[in-house]
Amino acid sequence: MKPLHLKLNNFGPFLKEEIDFSKIDNNELFLISGKTGSGKTMIFDAMTYALFGKASTEQREENDLRSHFADGKQPMSVTFEFQLNHRIYKVHRQGPYIKEGNTTKTNAKFDVFEMVDGKYEIRESKVISGTQFIIELLGVNADQFRQLFILPQGEFKRFLISNSREKQGILRTLFDSEKFEAIREILKEEVKKEKAQIENRYQQIDLLWQEIESFDDDNIKGLLEVATQQIDKLIENIPLLQARSKEILASVNESKETAIKEFEIIEKKTLENNILKDNINQLNKNKIDFVQLKEQQPEIEGIEAKLKLLQDITNLLNYIENREKIETKIANSKKDISKTNNKILNLDCDKRNIDKEKKMLEENGDLIESKISFIDKTRVLFNDINKYQQSYLNIERLRTEGEQLGDELNDLIKGLETVEDSIGNNQSDYEKIIELNNTITNINNEINIIKENEKAKAELDKLLGSKQELENQINEETSILKNLEIKLDRYDKTKLDLNDKESFISEIKSAVNIGDQCPICGNEIQDLGHHIDFDSIAKRQNEIKEIEANIHAIKSNIAVHNSEIKFVNEKISNINIKTQSDFSLEVLNKRLLENENALNNQRDLNKFIEQMKEEKDNLTLQIHNKQLRLNKNESELKLCRDLITEFETLSKYNNITNFEVDYKKYVQDVNQHQELSKEIEDKLMQLSQRKLIEQNNLNHYENQLETYNNDLELNEQSIEMEMSRLNLTDDNDIDEIIAWRGEQEELEQKRDTYKKRYHEIEMEIARLESLTKDKELLDSDKLKDEYELKKGKMNTLIDEYSAVHYQCQNNINKTQSIVSHINYLNQELKDQQEIFQLAEIVSGKNNKNLTLENFVLIYYLDQIIAQANLRLATMSDNRYQLIRREAVSHGLSGLEIDVFDLHSNKSRHISSLSGGETFQSSLALALGLSEIVQQQSGGISLESIFIDEGFGTLDQETLETALDTLLNLKSTGRMVGIISHVSELKNRIPLVLEVKSDQYQSSTRFKRN
């Protein structure tokens, strides 16, 4: 990731500020400088906040980032543009705030844009999803960003001096090692679950074993005394237990079957005795009922006599009823004959009236026939009258259109001849255009190669000149450096140390006298005068310091120039001069112009020919269409003439309107005549049919009357014969018998009921006598007592058998469950043994006492330390190396870092380093960390790094080494920014981002030294 542009509104001390990082050329090293509290670190906070919604340091909350001088109605926002993998993105984040005058908080906003074809297109517009998009895009979260891109103030050396637990938190975030801890927890939970399941199975086995029924049997009790943990012994005892249970069940079953047989015998005897007793009682009752039934015999015989008489008189009664019906029919037939005769007379009168109307209508028949003839002949004309009328209307228009179409057709034919003359023998040549295009492309390629080579040669000359200038500067500075070193060597440094002893010598002089023994050398003091020129010594010391400072500055300049020469050499190696044509640029441009002119001429000719061909095709099509229209016009004109001739010939009319009026009038007259004729014919037909019907009815009624008279005569003869047979003299005898008919159904029912009951009792007495014959009735009370005794014994044994059978089956089920649990338990212990061992190993129960996560983190830390030591060796002049403390214990350990001093060949605690040495180690470790994370993550693009403070603890030489390290980072293509108050850095680093504050707000600007 490489910053391009940063815009801050109401953020920290910046009310409205923009920083254009594109002014930093070639990823050069730059310094961020300013007074304390001016807002230098806020620049890093702004970049981190724009991307992740957090500050660059964990101590700063989001609310602390808003400017105290911001307008209460304006939000805090940051807009950050950056480049990642050759693609440009922009993020805009607005912080939440309570707008002045409101009580509710305005929510945060976050938008992510990507530049596509020179314009920004939105990718995300929500805070949570947008932040997640940035994390996935960069490949790091906020904590990783602080470790890789921004080394914040106060946290620069945190990773170096942190203990194992703190390092674990940092490394866990950077290398996503929580998944290994998650694996450990998963395995731990799995083992816990498996152990719980195993324990549960032991409990289930024990519970089932305790629930097995012993039947108070000593053998079973002995088998059940085995402890449930002895699962192998349980397996041995289970078959024995099941066999003994079956023996007990068989014994109980035998007793039960004997009791059932004894009960069935007494039950059968009791049932038979009860049936015999019931049959005897029923027999006695039926005999009494039979005697009572016989007493009703005389009454039943009287009823049967009446019913016989009623049956015999039935025929006579039927004849009497039939006589009445026949007499009624004769009267009705006479009435029908009279009515029918009257209807026939009325129909004859109606027919005479209609015949008169028909005669009057036939007198107009000739006139109607002539009209029908006209209608038949002209019906086809009238049905298509619109066709003939349209012909009269269109004939003149078609004559005019035909003449006009003929003129237009002649004009088009003349135009076609003109176009064909223009085309002549010319043809389009597109192959020539392709050939010319290829030639022009080749010439352009040759011209571009020549121009690129000229540009590359100019760039090469410029770079060679820059390189020569830098080498000259290095030679000049090397010469000056040698002179300064020679000048420095001329000073006698051994006498310069007395300058610091001036006050000490004065104290000794004040304490001794001439002739005393010197407390330093032991000689006698001869003189107390001034033998040392301390002013001269101080002057020489200042001269030496000035020379050393100049030497140091020249060395720094030489190092910078060497880095710049290295960068120039890389550019020179990237310059590629291609093989070019032997022709000059002028000749190629001339050939290009000639071919372009030829191409344009051929294109114009092709275009002209295509236009003429298109015009020819267009004219041909128009001529064809005109000819079709002319043919159609002539056809339509002929059709109109034929239709008019046809109309006038058939109708004898030359006016459509007159024809239509007369035709419709004739049709109306004919229709009226035909309707009236049809109506009269229909009436005559109806009258004829009605008269025929009535005549048939009259014949029918007369035949019926004759039949009824004959039936009446025969019926009277039958009545006389029946009365004679029954010895009846008059109608009174008949009436008396008829009176009995109301009681006939009741009498029949009474008779039938008596006979049915008589037969049933007779049959039942015979059945019961056969069932009780030769059988003795036993004492019911004795049988009942014996029955209850046998039944109680049987039920007791059945219940006992059911209980024993259930308990045996239950024992079998439980022993089967126990066997199933034991088999599953054995298999489970076998299957889970590897998981138990793996869980112990990843939890730290191994020869190194390390958890899986700590083992992985130690691996990454070793990689980081190895990478860091490459730079620390250079910065410490091969004195210090970082090492990981090997002493480990169970849990979080093994991540502490010590320093190994190659001078003493011993390792010591990191806190024993000086401030400058700690900075060197922290910087080397931080750079090593970022590089290892980039190697492991793959997708992270580290194109920039920013360092906040830490350089103030370095001496001049160490500062030079640190700067060389950062310059090497810059030469690898990474933008490096530093925040520092060290004045030496302002002189050494040419590009400075100044942050100025007026106690109200801050502003920034880039300047070059």
UniProtKB/Swiss-Prot annotation:
Annotated ATP binding sites: G34, K35, T36, G37, S38, G39, K40, T41
Coiled-coil intervals, chain numbering: 176-364, 392-502, 535-802
MF (Gene Ontology): ATP binding; ATP hydrolysis activity; endonuclease activity; exonuclease activity
The keyword Metal-binding appears for this protein: no
Domain of life, source organism: Bacteria
Keywords on record: ATP-binding, Coiled coil, DNA recombination, DNA replication, Endonuclease, Exonuclease, Hydrolase, Nuclease, Nucleotide-binding
Gene3D superfamilies: Helix hairpin bin (1.10.287.510), P-loop containing nucleotide triphosphate hydrolases (3.40.50.300)
UniProt GO BP: DNA recombination; DNA replication; double-strand break repair
Quaternary data: Heterodimer of SbcC and SbcD.
Family indicated by similarity: Belongs to the SMC family. SbcC subfamily.
Function: SbcCD cleaves DNA hairpin structures. These structures can inhibit DNA replication and are intermediates in certain DNA recombination reactions. The complex acts as a 3'->5' double strand exonuclease that can open hairpins. It also has a 5' single-strand endonuclease activity.
Protein's name in the database: Nuclease SbcCD subunit C
